[in-house]
C-alpha cells in the first residue's frame, strides 16, 4: 500500500495521502504486477516484505480482513517464487486503539489460517498512547499474545515493526517528550519486554526529535 487512485475501488473516506489510498484494489492483477515488479527489482537486496501498513486503521485500509488476507497470500506466492529466501511479514496492526485492533487482527489471523499461513511473521505496532510508557506497551504485547493463543495460531515470529513513546493520541492526548535518562531506560525496558513476549524484531520509529527533516 497505499493504493494508487487509478486502481482504487472507492475514492470515499480517507484522503491520506491521496484519494482512494486506503481502498482495496480494483484490480488484483495490478497488485500482482506491482509485487512482481518490486521483487524483481530488489530480489537479494530486500530481505523482508511487510504487506501493508497499519491495516487495522481506516486511514490506511478500508477493505476487509479477508481482502487483506487475499492480498497477503497473492504477494506471498509471488515473493517466494521470485526470491525464496525473502521473508513475508503480514500486514501490521496497531494495538493502542482496542476497537480497531479487535475489528481487524483476530479476523485477519483467522483468514491467514484458512490460507495455510502465507506469512513468515506477523507484525504489530505497539505504540501506547502519548501519555503512556513501557508498561503500557507490554500490556499491548500481552494482548497480542493472548489473541494468538486464543485463536490457536502456530508459533510464528511476531515483529514490532514500528513503535515509539510520546506519539500524540488517541483523541486529544498530547504528544510527550522522552529524553535523557528516561529515554535510555525506556529503550532498554522495551527490548527486554520484546524478549519476554517473544517479539523477534523491534523497530523504533524514529530516533530523532521533531522536526524530523
Feature annotation, model-predicted:
Residues 164-213:
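Aromatic/acidic polysaccharide-binding cleft in carbohydrate-active enzymes
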Residues 72-83, 140-153:
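Surface-exposed amphipathic alpha-helices with a cationic face
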Residues 1-119, 123-129:
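Substrate-binding cleft and catalytic face of glycoside hydrolase catalytic domains
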Residues 60-65, 132-136, 178-179:
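Short, solvent-exposed loop/turn segments at secondary-structure boundaries
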Amino acid at each position: 500500500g497505499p493504493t494508487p487512485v487509478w486502481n482504487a475501488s472507492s475514492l470515499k473516506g480517507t484522503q491520506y495521502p491521496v484519494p482512494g489510498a486506503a481502498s482495496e484494489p480494483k484490480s488484483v492483477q495490478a497488485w500482482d504486477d506491482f509485487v512482481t515488479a518490486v521483487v524483481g527489482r530488489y530480489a537479494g537486496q530486500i530481505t523482508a516484505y511487510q504487506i501493508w501498513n497499519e491495516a487495522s486503521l481506516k486511514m490506511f485500509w478500508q477493505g476487509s480482513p479477508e481482502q487483506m488476507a487475499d492480498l497477503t497470500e497473492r504477494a506471498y506466492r509471488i515473493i517466494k517464487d521470485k526470491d525464496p529466501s525473502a521473508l513475508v511479514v503480514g500486514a501490521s496492526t496497531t494495538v493502542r486503539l482496542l476497537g480497531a485492533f479487535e475489528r481487524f487482527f483476530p479476523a485477519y489471523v483467522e483468514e491467514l489460517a484458512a490460507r495455510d499461513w502465507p506469512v513468515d511473521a506477523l507484525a504489530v505496532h505497539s505504540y501506547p498512547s502519548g501519555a503512556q510508557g513501557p508498561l503500557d506497551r507490554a500490556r499491548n504485547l500481552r494482548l497480542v499474545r493472548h489473541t494468538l493463543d486464543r485463536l490457536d495460531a502456530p508459533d510464528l515470529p511476531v515483529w514490532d515493526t514500528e513503535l515509539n513513546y510520546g506519539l500524540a493520541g488517541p483523541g486529544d492526548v498530547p504528544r510527550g517528550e522522552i529524553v535523557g535518562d528516561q529515554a535510555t531506560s525506556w529503550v532498554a525496558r522495551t527490548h527486554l519486554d520484546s524478549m519476554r513476549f517473544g517479539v523477534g524484531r523491534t523497530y523504533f520509529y524514529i530516533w530523532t526529535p521533531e522536526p524530523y527533516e
